[in-house]
Amino acid sequence: TKEEFVAAVNSEITNVDARIDADGYVVFSNDTGYAISFASSTELGITADAYGGFVKLESLDNTPITIQAGSKENGYGANNGRRSDLATMGFNESNLVNGKLAVTGNVYVDDSQLTGADGLKINGVLITELDGQSSTSVNANDKVAQINDKTDQHGVVATGFNQIVVTVDMSNGNMQTASDSTINGITVDLSGDATVTNVVEGINAALAGKIDIVASMEADTGKLVLTSNSGLTISIDDTGSSLYTAVTYTDGSAVTTALSSGAASARGYITLTSLDGSSIKIEDGKQD
C-alpha cells in the first residue's frame, strides 16, 4: 500500500522524509539540501529523475534580506551579474519597495495561458483565468491581471515590466531600407532617421496611443531602449534591413527569441509585492 511504501522509505532511505499530503500524493523532502533521486518504477508510477535542493537564507537580526543581480538595472556600474546568476542558486530577486517585500522572478513568463488547471496558488489562493481571456492571453500583463483579480484574498499585488536594449546600425544603407520596420506588428518608418535620437522619436510617434511600449536611448552606450511598464512581450523586426544587430534584456541576458534576420522577441517579468510586508508563498500545483 501507499502507507507501507512511505513507511519503508522513512525506515530505509537516508536524507529523505516521505509523507502523504492532503490530496493523497506522496511528498519527499529533506532539510539538508541533498538531491533526491529516483529510479524508474512502473508499479509506483515514478520515472527516473533527480531533484536538486534549495538554499534557505535566514536573517540573524530579523531584518529583510535583499537579493539582487549585480546589473546596471539594479544600480550597479556594469552588467556583471544577471538574473540567470540568481537562477543557478535557486533565488529570485528580493527587494524592499516602500517598506514592502517585492519578489521578481529570475526568468521571463512562458508563452502559455495561465489557467486554474495549472494549480498555481499564491498564499493558498488558486489563480484562475479571467472572463474574456483566451489561449493568446500569455503576456506578463495578462498574468498580472489574473493575480490582481484576487489581491483581496491573497494580499499580494503583481506588476509587470519588460525592457530590452537594441544595438542599431545607423549606416546609410541600412536606414534607407528601414521604411517598414515593425514593433509588435506596428509599422515604424525609420528610413529618414540619421541618429538614434531620431529613431527614438520616430518609434514613440508611431506607437503613441496604440501600445504600452516607449523608446528611449541608453545614456552611457547610445543604444536604443524599449520599455513596457505593463510587461508586454516586445517583438521587433527590421524586415531584413540589417538595422538591428544585437538585442538583450537590460541586465545583458539573452532575450526569449534571439535576433535572427532582424527579428527578435522578449517576454516580460512579474514582480509580486506583499501588501502587509509578510512573506509570499507560491505553489505551482505541478505533481510528478
What are these regions (language model features)?
Residues 1-69, 75, 107-284:
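Extended, beta-strand-rich, solvent-exposed assembly scaffolds of outer structural proteins
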Residues 74-106, 288:
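Short, cationic low-complexity segments
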